[in-house]
Design a protein with these regions (language model features):
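Transmembrane alpha-helical insertion/packing segments
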Residues: 5-43, 132-133, 141, 205, ...
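Membrane-helix interface linkers and caps
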Residues: 2-5, 39-87, 91, 98-109, ...
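Hydrophobic alpha-helical transmembrane segments
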Residues: 25-36, 67-79, 101-109, 172-185, ...
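Alpha-helical membrane-inserting segments
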Residues: 26-35, 56-61, 92-104, 169, ...
């Protein structure tokens, strides 16, 4: 009887995860359509499409499920090699996108054209959004909730599914294969280290590197298939492979007595109130911009 109840609960959690995943992907697609017509705070999209579903899945829809979140501490060696992996991931990702773009007869939008010459305040805003908010909400949803909720289907299958959902959440483009591979890497890191911090660190530093390259004007060195660009990125690919190998091989910190995060109901309410406060603040700021 007990085994049957556990099985039933697992099916409910799996269905909930799939439902929230569909909602997140649909919300991301709708947000891209709205953002193309109406100026909206970029961090609000990540919050509503991924942060809110993660919170619903971890706290409400099936009760408190924080034990799904991999929360083992990282060792200094892991942190170092993971940080280098995130920074150097720009090389294989941009090279793959350019090769696929060339095969398709066109190139992707150059990094240098996106935000080159941006003022420092704009750079800081981009860094806060792309290197903090977006990785936090996306990793919390995909690697923190969905990957744990679907673990009963096997690590490899779930990693492939989560990576595909992660790639589709960014839209259909020449970057889709690269985003899928990045999703696989982030899933593998979370599984190997037993810590969501690993995928969060790599994701955040990868995004931060893209922003800094774009704003500094150095993004031109990572675009196109010129000899210099290809040579530079091929060397970077070698360094990326080495850093990734060391990150997987590095020994983790000693695990704590309890695996998973544990919050009291009062802490959960405070967290929910904080999240809702952020949502209201973003909505009010947008409303004030429209009115004034």
């Amino acid at each position: 009887m007990k085994r049957r109840k556990l099985s039933a609960r697992r099916r409910v959690r799996t269905g909930s995860a799939l439902f929230l995943c569909v909602c997140a992907l649909a919300g991301a697609a709708l947000w891209r359509m709205l953002a193309a017509r109406v100026t909206m705070p970029p961090e609000m999209g990540a919050l509503l499409c991924f942060g809110l579903p993660a919170m619903i899945g971890l706290f409400f829809i099936d009760g408190i499920q924080l034990r799904l979140v991999p929360s083992r501490a990282l060792s200094p060696a892991q942190t170092l090699w993971l940080a280098l992996t995130g920074v150097l991931a720009v090389c294989p990702m941009t090279l793959l996108a350019d090769v696929l773009g060339a095969l398709a007869g066109r190139f992707t939008l150059p990094l240098a054209a996106a935000t080159a010459g941006a003022v420092p305040t704009a750079v800081l805003k981009l860094l806060v959004n792309d290197a903090l908010f977006v990785p936090l909400f996306e990793e919390g949803f995909f690697r923190g909730y969905v990957q744990g909720a679907l673990a009963c289907y096997g690590e490899k299958r779930v990693a492939a599914f989560v990576a595909l959902a992660f790639a589709l959440a960014h839209g259909l483009s020449m970057n889709l294969p690269g985003l899928f591979l990045m999703g696989l890497l982030l899933c593998a890191l979370a599984l190997r280290t037993g810590s969501l911090l690993s995928s969060l660190l790599v994701h955040g530093l990868y995004n931060a590197t893209l922003v800094l390259l774009s704003c500094s004007g150095l993004g031109a060195l990572f675009d196109g298939l010129t000899p210099l660009s290809c040579l530079l990125r091929l060397l970077g690919c070698g360094a990326f492979a080495y850093a990734m190998r060391r990150a997987f091989a590095a020994k983790g910190a000693l695990p704590s007595q309890e695996s998973g995060l544990h919050l009291e109901h009062r802490d959960m309410l405070w967290l929910g109130a904080a999240l809702m406060s952020v949502v209201l603040a973003l909505l009010l700021s947008r409303l004030m911009e429209v009115l004034l």
